[in-house]
């Protein structure tokens, strides 16, 4: 393997480690890397790690961890790492490095550079196997020396100096791999192999799971600085030279001293290095690692323990490396050493897990997940070494510390608690107690017990973890709290607080860094000691033999790890997991993984139970109340806390944790632990807020988390997921909710469906939009990976997560595509309405596909999708509409709310089905009204159905999605995708996305372009015009409104929802731009339909085709007119919607070139469609939608808009030319017609513009023609059914064609109906006759004071809207016409901008006029229908009704009132009069 020395060297050299090799820091990125960067090379490596991809780093770490080639990486550095517990032991023992698997997982968990990789553990496994083979085949010392003897040892010397250099590098490494590397001084090489074995055994015993490596380094740091202060260490230093050469004879104590002396005085010899590798933990209090792992099974690397660095540096300024500042410490991944059987009594159990020190945390889990099996030979060798080292230590000055030897040798079943030598001769029991206290603290910390504050007391109270029993049960608590506290307090009093950067990442407030604080709290170090001591106690019940590093540890560990809170403020520090920057439960949090004392104690499955059961009285006496509470909170949530039963669960937990880490690709243990801590805190406060990432979630503890969105089991349960969502929704903790929601969302992807629904915008919304969720997204990513590799949480981060991302992108897509579309297919009719309205169906798949934006929301959305996908999504859409307001109104609760309240979610994330439907509602305030969610299904009035064509053959409504699908597909712009068959869209996530995009475009272009005029015109008036308007061609631009369409429909939808909300709630926003027409449409009583028409007509024909009959009003006038006005306004006036349309139309024209053949036939109809779109608004759109519905509509919109802009720019060139022409008469008509034609084209389902757009030439001709002199109108006027001629006339004869247009629009509605606007025909016939001239003329007149008469054609378009949806569309058309009129002259455009708010009112007025034109009975019926619909909607969605929906309903009602008030006014109103009346109406 590369991990072998030669390959490793090459690899290191070839990779970031070239510089590292120079310094001898072999493994910078690897949390578990054999050697952490300990020199400037570490800086370089760290910097490179920063730049390196996480996968690269992970590979590096895996390679280094797999091959603890201290040789390549400066044996000394690596040895030091090992000394500090980075590795299990010497090269042989470095099979422990195959902890590296755990370390790899730990590294991931630690959030180090190690990238989330599902192969990380396999890598480590392979490396472990290779390492075992090599270790078995080669002498431990020789192999290690061979690997890095020449360069590594010397570089180690250099590294020791460079450790000072590392200060800067360490700072950077700490930031990057701080979790991975314990920035600490390189550990002095071990004295002898035996010492190494003993130290490694103790270290492994004490060593936390791989993530715990860092605590080891910390321990090493702590102990090394302490070593000089330790008298025993002096002996060790004296012996160190011997041990350097004599791997087997020198005592661990000698090694400990030797380590510093080697570091300080001479370059350590290979043997020294190997010994140090074996005994590196001698200096390091293993508790630290245990703490790291305890707190977080893999946290120790997280804890890389800058705190330890600080402590060690502080405590260890005597050593060469200790001298450098905290950042300078060796950035060695503290590879938690898996204690070998000889080393750890629990090694037997750990044997499976091979997690000696990790056994506590990682060993149990590792047995399942990371079966780090150290070769028996190595194990035996380690045992022998441990025994020899223990014997030597026993005979050494640190004889009390040597006490571990019996445990190492005599109590292999139990992790021998590394009895830290008391700096001042504290009893080994006392030392053990600290360690155990650490375990207790770890469990408590993990348990989330309130160890953070009052940690001193807490630790004292905790000192005896309920499961861990000190040798002297009654004495231990007090002793631990006292004696441990004494040395630790003394020791920590000198220790600098943990570097702020340590906590910067995790937001954990920097606290006086107390090495043992985290480890104590996390029971990392103490856990090891506890495991050893407790195990020994349980088996031998003798004070855990003081570890050779007990002196170092004692000062730190005796007081620090296990010391309750040496610092009075240890509590806070404990809270931040001193070592780990992760607030995750700070070491407490890991306890859920069984990483706490649970795991540590668990290594010997019986011991923890015995310890807990027996020592519980003593240890529990103090800590039990607290620890029991905390553990009860955590342990239950965890897989059983620190009890015996937890041992396997801990192991499973660790395994699960590591697996989860790998699967979910947690970038760092810290991230994972962060999630865990949050989850733990959540769980402690509320069991609901359990983090799926916690191993418990994966372990049997899931039942507790069943309501937890992060539960992997529940994850697979759609309904449970939904329940979880609801539970999360109910969960009061906002942060837990987002995390739960996000994890829940991720679980939804796991479920495959729930995500879409719960989160409507879950797809793109969550992580990308929500950073807080992004963390959860990563967590869910991993969670998803672990729980269900298929779709982790839909999330950009998921995409980043590689396999997880792929799964989300692909698997999620297919599940969403298959599941959501299939379910949507089940409710296709409803979904079609809903999707057409809210592009819910279309969006559902699309959101699933595009989970980036609403990934945070997505997880809930996915769950909702799962639960509500088929019929529920729609049914739930109604309930979402009603409920979504509540659950979705809060974004964080979105996951929970998603399932119920898509409306709210749509606001937040519109990606999901329910959210899509609600998104449409949000998008088009009218959409809410248009689509009254009844029983979760959008109850659309006839208009609504017409919008979708649902009434017209449920699919023609989705023509935009379906018919335009080919065009859109051909169109190639965002629209082509959107123009997917509704069925296809429903069937495929992409298709659904396309349909959703198509609907979005309709909504956005027609309604949202106007509505989004708020958003898009301002953000992207020109680009937004083309982009947003030309949804198909400029998907991103449509994505401005529908940018999410590209990024994620959800994302787009959310903006759309916001804009819609703005528009519906703030028509003025819509009025801000020509989108006022869409806004007016929204404001119109037709808002119910307006949702689609604004969105649909704007979106082009998606709405129109769907609801051609109903759509005309909405589509043509609302969309087209608004766009037309927007085009002109956008172009000349700053009416971004108009410009958008102009641009969009132009783009459409460009696109139609390909589409021209198809649009060629509709070209003649395009004019008619324009007129129809103007007059009917829906009439034109319907046929074009079928022909080239969505993409064409979108394209046509782009084309129409662009030509409009081209014409606007050419003729208008600010729309002046066209608008001026319209003003002039022919030109005025041309301008308005151009705007209207284009708008109509876009609006009227590409009636002329879109038909032309789709038919390329028509759009191009119509739009370009319209540009100059309504030549577009000429092309458009080329009536499909002779309507185009009238359109031409209208274009050329501005006033006459205006009237003609009105008439033509009426005729066109029919003609276009015949062509594409067949549905519009009936609508036109229904509405057009009454509305066309009067309504259109009035709006035009009111709109363009100078050129309003010529612009009557535009008002005609409005009439078309009125005809299609007289109540809603006419206002939109009026606005469009007004906007066009205003736009035609720049002055007028300015005027139109001014009237924008009035135009909205005018729109209402136009609508009123149209209604007036309509027969009184018909108008009354319409109004009654609208009111009924509003009442229905309000009833259905009143309680949780979305604000947008409510605003839309209110606006609709207001519009109805204004319409009725305006109705008396004859349709023929002076423009000024009409505008004032509109203003009055609107006001």
From Swiss-Prot:
Q: Where is the composition biased (Basic and acidic residues)?
A: 609-621, 680-689, 740-749
The keyword Coiled coil belongs to this UniProt entry's keyword annotation: yes
Record carries keyword NAD: no
State the signal peptide span. Answer: none
Compositional bias ranges of the Low complexity kind? 141-153, 190-206, 220-251, 424-449, 474-483, 529-541, 754-774, 894-909, 1148-1158, 1204-1226, 1233-1251, 1284-1299
**Which stretches are annotated as coiled coil?**
1408-1438
**Which residue stretches does the UniProt record annotate as biased composition, category Polar residues?**
157-170, 252-264, 596-607, 622-640, 699-710, 841-876, 1096-1109, 1116-1125, 1188-1202, 1258-1276
| Protein keywords | Coiled coil
**Residue span of region Disordered:** 135-268, 306-334, 383-506, 518-653, 680-911, 949-976, 1013-1061, 1089-1299, 1454-1483
Q: What is this protein called?
A: Protein ORF C
The species this protein belongs to is Elephantid herpesvirus 1 (isolate Asian elephant/Berlin/Kiba/1998) (EIHV-1)
Q: Could you read off the lineage of the organism from its UniProt record? A: Viruses, Duplodnaviria, Heunggongvirae, Peploviricota, Herviviricetes
């Amino acid at each position: 393997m590369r991990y072998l020395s030669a390959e490793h060297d090459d690899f290191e050299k070839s990779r970031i480690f070239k510089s590292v090799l120079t310094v001898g820091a072999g493994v910078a990125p690897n949390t578990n890397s054999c050697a952490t960067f300990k020199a400037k090379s570490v800086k370089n490596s760290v910097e490179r790690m920063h730049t390196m991809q996480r996968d690269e780093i992970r590979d590096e770490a895996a390679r280094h961890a797999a091959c603890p080639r201290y040789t390549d990486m400066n044996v000394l550095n690596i040895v030091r790492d090992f000394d500090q517990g980075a590795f299990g032991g010497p090269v042989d023992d470095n099979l422990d490095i195959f902890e590296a698997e755990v370390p790899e997982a730990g590294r991931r968990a630690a959030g180090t550079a190690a990238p989330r990789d599902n192969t990380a553990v396999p890598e480590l496994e392979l490396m472990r196997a290779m390492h075992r083979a090599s270790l078995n085949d080669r002498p431990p010392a020789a192999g290690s020396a061979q690997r890095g003897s020449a360069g590594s040892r010397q570089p180690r010397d250099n590294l020791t100096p460079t450790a000072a250099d590392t200060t800067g590098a360490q700072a950077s490494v700490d930031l990057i791999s701080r979790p991975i590397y314990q920035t600490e001084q390189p550990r002095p090489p071990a004295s002898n192999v035996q010492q190494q074995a003993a130290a490694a055994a103790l270290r492994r015993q004490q060593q936390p799971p791989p993530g715990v490596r860092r605590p080891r380094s910390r321990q090493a740091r702590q102990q090394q600085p302490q070593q000089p202060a330790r008298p025993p260490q002096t002996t060790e230093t004296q012996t160190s030279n011997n041990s350097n050469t004599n791997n087997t004879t020198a005592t661990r104590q000698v090694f400990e001293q030797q380590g510093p002396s080697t570091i300080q005085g001479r370059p350590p010899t290979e043997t020294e290095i190997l010994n140090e590798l074996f005994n590196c933990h001698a200096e390091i209090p293993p508790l630290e690692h245990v703490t790291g792992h305890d707190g977080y099974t893999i946290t120790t690397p997280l804890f890389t323990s800058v705190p330890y660095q600080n402590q060690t540096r502080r405590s260890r300024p005597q050593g060469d490396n200790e001298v450098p500042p905290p950042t300078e410490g060796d950035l060695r991944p503290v590879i938690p050493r898996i204690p070998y059987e000889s080393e750890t009594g629990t090694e037997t159990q750990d044997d499976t897990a091979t997690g000696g020190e990790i056994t506590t945390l990682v060993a149990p889990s590792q047995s399942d997940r990371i079966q780090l099996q150290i070769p028996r030979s190595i194990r035996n060798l380690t045992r022998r070494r441990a025994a020899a080292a223990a014997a030597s230590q026993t005979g050494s000055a640190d004889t009390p510390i040597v006490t571990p030897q019996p445990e190492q040798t005599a109590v292999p079943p139990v992790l021998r608690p590394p009895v830290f030598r008391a700096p001042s001769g504290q009893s080994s029991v006392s030392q053990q107690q600290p360690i155990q206290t650490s375990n207790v603290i770890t469990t408590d910390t993990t348990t989330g017990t309130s160890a953070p504050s009052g940690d001193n007391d807490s630790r004292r109270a905790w000192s005896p973890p309920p499961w861990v029993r000190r040798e002297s049960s009654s004495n231990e608590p007090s002793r631990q709290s006292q004696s441990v506290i004494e040395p630790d307090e003394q020791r920590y009093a000198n220790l600098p607080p943990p570097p702020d950067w340590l906590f910067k990442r995790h937001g954990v407030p920097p606290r006086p860094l107390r090495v043992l604080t985290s480890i104590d709290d996390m029971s990392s170090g103490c856990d090891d000691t506890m495991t050893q001591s407790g195990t020994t106690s349980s088996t031998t019940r003798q004070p855990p033999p003081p570890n050779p590093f007990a002196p170092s540890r004692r000062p730190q560990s005796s007081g620090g790890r296990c010391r309750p809170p040496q610092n009075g403020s240890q509590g806070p520090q404990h809270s931040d997991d001193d070592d780990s920057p992760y607030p995750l439960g700070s070491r407490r949090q890991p306890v859920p993984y069984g990483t706490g004392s649970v795991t540590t104690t668990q290594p010997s499955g019986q011991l923890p139970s015995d310890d807990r059961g027996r020592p519980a009285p003593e240890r529990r006496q103090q800590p039990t109340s607290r620890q029991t509470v905390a553990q009860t909170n955590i342990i239950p949530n965890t897989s059983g806390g620190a009890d015996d039963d937890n041992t396997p669960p801990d192991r499973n937990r660790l395994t699960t944790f590591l697996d989860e880490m790998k699967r979910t690709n947690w970038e760092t243990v810290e991230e994972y632990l962060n999630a865990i801590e949050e989850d733990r805190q959540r769980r402690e406060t509320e069991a609901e807020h359990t983090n799926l990432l916690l191993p418990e979630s994966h372990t049997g503890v899931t039942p507790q988390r069943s309501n937890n969105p992060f539960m992997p089991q529940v994850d697979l349960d759609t309904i449970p997921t939904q329940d979880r969502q609801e539970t999360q929704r109910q969960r009061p903790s906002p942060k837990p909710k987002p995390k739960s929601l996000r994890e829940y969302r991720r679980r939804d992807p796991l479920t495959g469906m729930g995500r879409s629904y719960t989160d409507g915008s879950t797809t793109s919304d969550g992580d990308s939009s929500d950073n807080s969720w992004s963390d959860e997204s990563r967590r869910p990513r991993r969670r998803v990976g672990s729980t269900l590799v298929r779709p982790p949480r839909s999330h950009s981060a998921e995409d980043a997560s590689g396999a997880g991302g792929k799964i989300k992108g692909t698997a999620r897509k297919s599940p969403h595509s298959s599941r959501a579309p299939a379910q949507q297919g089940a409710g296709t009719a409803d979904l079609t309405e809903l999707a057409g309205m809210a592009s819910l169906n279309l969006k559902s798949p699309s959101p699933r596909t595009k989970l980036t934006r609403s990934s945070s929301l997505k997880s809930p959305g996915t769950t909702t999708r799962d639960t509500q996908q088929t019929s529920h999504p729609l049914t739930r859409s109604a309930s979402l509409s009603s409920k979504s307001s509540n659950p979705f109104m809060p974004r964080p609760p979105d996951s929970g709310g998603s399932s119920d309240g898509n409306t709210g979610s749509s606001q937040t994330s519109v990606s999901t089905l329910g959210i899509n439907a609600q998104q449409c509602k949000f998008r088009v305030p009218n959409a809410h009204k248009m689509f009254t969610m009844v029983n979760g299904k959008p109850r659309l009035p006839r208009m609504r159905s017409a919008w979708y064509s649902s009434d017209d053959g449920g699919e023609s409504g989705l023509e935009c999605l379906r018919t335009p699908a080919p065009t859109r597909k051909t169109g190639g712009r965002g629209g082509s995708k959107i123009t997917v068959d509704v069925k296809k869209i429903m069937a495929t996530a992409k298709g659904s996305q396309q349909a959703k995009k198509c609907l979005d475009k309709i909504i956005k272009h027609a309604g949202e372009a106007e509505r989004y005029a708020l958003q898009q015109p301002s953000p992207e008036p020109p680009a937004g015009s083309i982009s947003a308007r030309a949804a198909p061609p400029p998907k991103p631009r449509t994505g401005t409104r529908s940018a999410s369409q590209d990024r994620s429909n959800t994302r787009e939808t959310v903006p759309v929802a916001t804009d819609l909300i703005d528009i519906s709630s703030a028509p003025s926003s819509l009025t801000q731009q020509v989108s006022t027409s869409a806004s007016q449409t929204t404001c119109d009583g037709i808002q119910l339909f307006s949702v689609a028409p604004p969105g649909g007509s704007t979106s082009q024909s998606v709405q129109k085709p769907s609801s051609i009959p109903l759509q005309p009003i909405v589509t043509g006038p609302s969309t087209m007119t608004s766009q037309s006005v927007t085009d002109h306004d956008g172009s000349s006036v700053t009416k971004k919607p108009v410009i958008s349309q102009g641009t969009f139309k132009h783009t459409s024209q460009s696109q139609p070139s390909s589409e021209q053949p198809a649009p060629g036939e509709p070209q003649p109809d395009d004019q008619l469609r324009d007129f129809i779109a103007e007059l009917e608004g829906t009439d034109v759109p319907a046929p074009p939608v079928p022909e080239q519905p969505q993409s064409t509509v979108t394209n046509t919109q782009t084309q129409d808009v662009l030509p409009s802009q081209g014409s606007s720019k050419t003729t208008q060139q600010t729309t002046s030319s066209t608008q001026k022409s319209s003003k002039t008469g022919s030109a005025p008509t041309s301008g308005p017609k151009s705007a209207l034609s284009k708008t109509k084209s876009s609006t009227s389902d590409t009636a002329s513009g879109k038909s032309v757009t789709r038919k390329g030439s028509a759009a191009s001709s119509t739009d370009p023609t319209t540009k100059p002199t309504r030549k577009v109108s000429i092309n458009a006027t080329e009536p499909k059914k002779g309507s185009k001629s009238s359109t031409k006339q209208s274009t050329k004869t501005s006033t006459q064609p205006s009237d003609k247009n009105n008439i033509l629009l009426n005729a066109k509605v029919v003609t276009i109906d015949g062509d594409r606007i067949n549905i519009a025909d009936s609508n036109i016939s229904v509405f057009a006759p009454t509305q066309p001239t009067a309504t259109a003329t009035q709006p035009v007149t009111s709109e363009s004071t100078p050129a309003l008469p010529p612009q009557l054609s535009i008002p005609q378009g409005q009439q078309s809207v009125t005809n299609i949806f007289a109540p809603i569309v006419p206002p939109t058309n009026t606005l469009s016409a007004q906007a066009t009129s205003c736009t035609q002259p720049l002055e007028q455009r300015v005027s139109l901008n001014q009237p924008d708010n009035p135009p909205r009112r005018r729109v209402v007025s136009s609508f009123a006029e149209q209604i007036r034109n309509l027969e009184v009975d018909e108008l009354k019926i319409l109004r009654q229908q609208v009111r009924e619909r509003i009442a229905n909607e309000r009833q259905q969605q009143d309680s949780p009704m979305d604000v947008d929906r409510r605003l839309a309903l209110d606006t609709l009602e207001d519009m109805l009132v204004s319409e009725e008030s305006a109705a008396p006014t004859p349709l023929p109103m002076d423009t000024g009069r009409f505008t004032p009346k509109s203003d009055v109406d609107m006001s």
